[in-house]
From Swiss-Prot:
PANTHER family: F-BOX ONLY PROTEIN 32 (PTHR13123:SF6), LD30288P (PTHR13123). This is F-box only protein 32. Keywords: Cytoplasm, Nucleus, Ubl conjugation pathway. Coiled coil: none annotated. Specifically expressed in cardiac and skeletal muscle. Its main location: cytoplasm.
């Protein structure tokens, strides 16, 4: 059988694109297409330069994307939560998808929803950061940056955000040290950059100086004692009572009121928990202040928020409380169940 093809060990042929079409490129000994050699080299240089420009543009775009503040999510008031595949709908809703689609960026501007979002960010930073997608992690950092900027501007909730940043930094340190053993979305350099960003935010909060208001009007010390006690009873954190007592000598006496700390203990903890942590003072009376800080270290405090996320049991739609959603139930309000931040995370554990 004759061998029709070329030797498989040959280097092959070289072709050059000309005005008349593609033609085979020959060496100088053959005397053909020698004039096309320079144009061929020029085209090779042009091709290499184009590749270099494309690579440079890609690197520039990657750098801009890593620093951009744009959030890749849909600002919706409600989402449908489905946990399994059906004939009509395939797939399921994840925590990262819900975090991207719900409008948390606007929620932090609402004082009634601010504490809820901050608590949710803290829980995600503590244990659920690696379960988020790359876009969800980027959205998480963008929302956290907005929270920090809001605190720096308003000079409120400073301690709350400090604790959030400390939790995030501890989690990032653990994840970076365990690289290769745990699933990390993205380059390790991006995680190190997030650690540096978190440290920078902590330094900004530590260096903040609360400015006095420009106007001079009534202060809390100018109010009657009964109103001062009424204001203190509205505080749900014992550390706020201690800080308020350090602001003025008159307030320090009120902040040590036994009845005030007793009500605070009864608000956060059950009677059974209180009976297990009884502490007596030198006078033989219950020291409710010491009992409170002892109970805080042993049991979680009661969480109460102005506005929470709610889940409709009838149509499985997740939305903010007070917002309407398309529901076929006769009384949608009776089908809605409020979700705490931990309940929101547990909703996506399969």
């Amino acid at each position: 059988m004759p061998f029709l093809g070329q030797d498989w060990r040959s280097p092959g042929q070289s072709w050059v694109k000309t005005a008349d079409g593609w033609k085979r490129f020959l060496d100088e000994k053959s005397g053909t297409f020698v004039s096309d050699l320079s144009s061929y080299c020029n085209k090779e240089n042009l091709f290499n330069s184009l590749n270099y420009d494309v690579a440079a543009k890609k690197r520039k775009k990657d750098i801009q994307n890593s620093k951009t503040k744009t959030q890749y999510f849909h600002q919706e008031k409600w989402i449908y939560v489905h946990k399994g595949s059906t004939k009509e709908r395939h797939g399921y809703c994840t925590l990262g998808e819900a975090f991207n689609r719900l409008d948390f960026s606007t929620a932090i501007l609402d004082s009634r929803r601010f504490n809820y979002v901050v608590r949710l960010l803290e829980l995600i930073a503590k244990s659920q950061l690696t379960s988020l997608s790359g876009i969800a992690q980027k959205n998480f950092m963008n929302i956290l940056e907005k929270v920090v900027l809001k605190v720096l501007e308003d000079q409120q909730n400073i301690r709350l955000i400090r604790e959030l940043l400390q939790t995030l930094y501890t989690s990032l340190c653990t994840l970076v040290q365990r690289v290769g053993k745990s699933v990390l979305v993205g380059n390790i350099n991006m995680w190190v950059y997030r650690m540096e960003t978190t440290l920078h935010w902590q330094q900004q909060l530590n260096s903040i100086q609360i400015s006095r208001p420009a106007f001079k009007g009534l202060t809390i010390t100018d109010l009657p004692v009964c109103l001062q006690l009424n204001i203190m009873q509205r505080l749900s954190d014992g550390r706020d009572l201690v800080s308020l007592g350090q602001a003025a000598p008159d307030l320090h006496v009120l902040s040590e009121d036994r009845l005030l700390w007793k009500r605070l203990c009864q608000y956060h903890f059950s009677e059974r928990q209180i009976r297990k942590r009884l502490i007596l003072s030198d006078k033989g009376q219950l020291d409710w202040k010491k009992m409170y800080f002892k109970l805080v270290r042993c049991y979680p405090r009661r969480e109460q928020y102005g506005v929470t996320l709610q889940l409709c049991k009838h149509c499985h739609i997740l939305s903010w409380k007070g917002t309407d959603h398309p529901c076929t139930a006769n009384n949608p309000e009776s089908c809605s169940v409020s979700l705490s931040p931990q309940d929101f995370i547990n909703l996506f554990k399969f």
